[in-house]
Design a protein with these regions (language model features):
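Non-catalytic, polymerase-adjacent accessory regions of viral genome-replication enzymes
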Residues: 1-20
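Catalytic-core region of right-hand nucleic acid polymerases
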Residues: 19-153, 204, 238, 242-289
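A short catalytic or substrate-binding loop motif that flags glycine-/basic-rich loops and adjacent residues
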Residues: 47-53, 62-64, 119-120, 308, ...
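Residue-level marker for buried hydrophobic side chains located in beta-strands
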Residues: 68-70, 105, 180-181, 338-342
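Short, conserved secondary-structure transition motifs
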Residues: 102, 111-114, 187-188, 214-236
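Active-site palm subdomain of RNA-directed nucleic acid polymerases
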Residues: 149-202, 214
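C-terminal reverse transcriptase regions that engage the nucleic-acid substrate
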Residues: 219-331
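RNase H-like nuclease fold core
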Residues: 329-362
Length: 362
């Protein structure tokens, strides 16, 4: 898949920082061999280097076990590029109503970022060296560039047939609902309509030489999507075990940094939509978090600075964490207990999305 043509502007404008600065991190020789073999990097031609990447790896927990993900971070370009990514990732409450449908199919792209080819004229912006000194450049879409999620969201939406992205002749029928989250697709509706459009999406992906992950749900009534467990049989939703474990693993709010506090607050708002929690009861905690975020933008504090939340705010936050833990434990012992998605007229989804946008405002 090519980046150009999917985004209506040059995706990688020239850097404004002047002379590019080479990073100190290099790709291990063994890793470089594998990346070359996979077609992710190639030897750089004798043209001027426009930008450098910082290569590193992280370990992710997947259903099949631990997986190492290689990331190319163009730090200077992310800082100097004036373009700000814009893609419609909405509050989780927007993705709950499809549980009322009969069934759904869930698909995702395998190694999605590396499936997108970089145009040759942009590859000089993403270079680094191997341990032996060889100069190489990316040939595939870099995971770490700030516009990458938007580009992939557009490509995935086109393959899924989202009506706001493709021509009506190639759009999904009105009988199914399509939800796209970067490289994840959910098709909801009647089981026959869902499986029919799923087959078309697979043909679309094959036509663009895009590889779909092996672990996909086809016409399912029970599945996990965006850290939420969907039960179409009982028309109910609940927090996934992985999400709850991530909340339990977060440090205590009375000793957290500002960055940890922000992550915890965003997950609280996420869970509130699933549990139908009244966020008005936690206004003091949310307001305390919101007041600390502009200080990062203004350079007053660092993300690693202590959050120093007031004791009352800490108590509210830890109380919500306890609610998440207790609710999940009770659900595991009593499977019949479920949360129904809030109706459009109720306060939970509206407050959740509103406060989430205020949290991110700096």
């Amino acid at each position: 898949m090519q980046v150009c043509g999917h985004v209506g502007r040059p995706p990688f404008p020239p850097s404004s920082s002047g002379k590019a600065r080479e990073g100190s991190r290099r790709i291990p020789t063994a890793d470089a061999h594998l990346l070359r073999k996979a077609g992710i990097i190639g030897d750089a031609p004798s043209t001027i280097t426009g930008g450098w990447i910082i290569p590193f790896s992280v370990v992710e927990e997947k259903t099949a076990g631990l997986r190492r993900r290689w990331i190319a971070w163009p730090r200077d370009k992310n800082r100097d590029d004036p373009y700000e990514a814009n893609f419609p990732l909405l509050h989780i409450s927007h993705y709950l109503p499809p549980v009322m449908a009969e069934a759904a199919s869930c698909l995702d792209f395998k190694a999605s970022f590396f499936q997108v080819s970089l145009p040759r004229e942009t590859r000089h912006l993403f270079r680094c060296r191997v341990e032996d000194g060889t100069l190489v450049e990316l040939t595939r879409h870099p995971m770490g560039y700030k516009a990458s999620p938007e580009i992939l969201q557009i490509i995935t939406s086109a393959i899924a047939g989202v009506t706001t992205v493709v021509h009506r002749l190639w759009a999904a029928p009105s009988l199914v609902r399509i939800d796209v989250w970067i490289d994840n697709i959910r098709i909801a509706g009647s089981k026959s309509d869902v499986t029919l459009w799923e087959a078309q999406v697979l043909r679309n992906a094959d036509g663009r030489h895009a590889t779909i992950g092996e672990e996909r749900e086809s016409g399912a009534t029970h599945y996990t999507f965006l850290w939420v467990q969907f039960d179409h049989t009982h028309r109910a939703v609940s927090l996934s075990e992985k999400f709850v474990l991530s909340v339990c693993a977060m440090p205590a709010l009375n000793s957290s940094t500002i960055a940890e506090m922000e992550v915890m607050a965003s997950r609280f708002l996420y869970a509130a939509a699933i549990l139908c929690t009244r966020l008005c009861d936690y206004h003091f905690f949310i307001n305390a978090v919101r007041r600390r975020l502009p200080a990062i933008h203004q350079g007053i504090v660092l993300e690693t600075s202590p959050a120093n939340l007031p004791p009352a705010a800490v108590g509210l936050g830890e109380g919500l964490r306890h609610t998440i833990e207790v609710t999940t434990v009770s659900e595991s012992s009593s499977p019949q207990k479920r949360h129904w998605p809030p109706h459009h007229g109720r306060i939970a989804p509206w407050l959740g999305s509103r406060f989430y946008s205020r949290l991110r405002r700096r």
